[in-house]
Curated annotation (Swiss-Prot):
Protein name in UniProt: Ribosome hibernation promotion factor
SUPFAM superfamilies recorded: Ribosome binding protein Y (YfiA homologue)
Stated family: Belongs to the HPF/YfiA ribosome-associated protein family. Long HPF subfamily.
A GO molecular-function annotation: ribosomal small subunit binding
Role summary: Required for dimerization of active 70S ribosomes into 100S ribosomes in stationary phase; 100S ribosomes are translationally inactive and sometimes present during exponential growth.
Annotated organism of origin: Streptococcus pyogenes serotype M6 (strain ATCC BAA-946 / MGAS10394)
A cellular component annotation (GO) from this entry: cytosolic small ribosomal subunit
A GO BP entry: negative regulation of translational elongation
Subunit composition and interactions: Interacts with 100S ribosomes.
InterPro entries: HPF/YfiA_ribosome-assoc, HPF_long/plastid, RHF-like, RHF/RaiA, Ribosom_S30AE_C, Ribosom_S30AE_C_sf
Predominant place of localization: cytoplasm
């Protein structure tokens, strides 16, 4: 059973939108065990230029499913995001099946009644370069400047105040995000 948490930013989540989101996401219930409770977090945003962003996050025990879409049509974005989530489920199930052949732990996340569909073969990603870095103590502003000077989308550094390892990264919207390791 899916529990929905639907939130809107710069938009009122009407009953029609809520019903549409729930009806579309309910179709993925067939992929999960009947007794499994699934939390689906849906975030709907509308921007000044009237484009909308739909984000769906479904945290599971072994994996987090997440998809987003930005377009002028919120209902179209909802459809695309649900399709992306479905593809992720199929890929995940296929990868688990390939990795464990006979002993597929599908009951942990996905229902055993669901047959893994073969998806377009994705080339295996390989680590092609290893780089050792010395983390220097600095504040966020200095890390931002270093990241921009290097032309990177992320920068790892040691926080000069608490000594924690932090990762500063550029988000898709152009802003910056900060991951603080504990």
């Amino acid at each position: 059973m899916i529990k929905f948490s639907i939130r809107g930013e710069n938009i009122e989540v009407t009953e029609a939108i809520r019903d549409y989101v729930e009806s579309k996401l309910t179709k993925i219930e067939k992929y999960f065990a009947k007794d499994q409770e699934i939390d689906a977090r849906v975030n709907l945003k509308v921007y000044r230029e009237r484009s909308s962003k739909v984000e769906v996050t479904i945290p599971l025990d072994s994996v987090t499913l997440r998809a987003e879409d930005v377009s002028q049509d919120m209902y179209g974005s909802i459809d695309l995001v649900v399709d992306k989530i479905e593809r992720q489920i199929r890929k995940n199930k296929t990868k688990i099946a390939k990795k464990h052949r006979e002993k597929v732990p599908t009951g942990q996340v996905f229902t055993t009644e669901f047959e893994a569909e073969e998806v377009d073969e994705i080339p295996e990603v390989q680590v092609v370069r290893t780089k050792n870095v010395t983390l220097k103590p600095m504040d966020v502003e200095e890390a931002r400047l270093q990241m921009e000077l290097l032309g990177h989308d992320f920068f790892i550094y040691t926080d000069s105040e608490d000594g924690a390892t932090n990762i500063l990264y550029r988000r898709e919207d152009g802003n910056l995000g900060l991951i603080e390791a504990k």
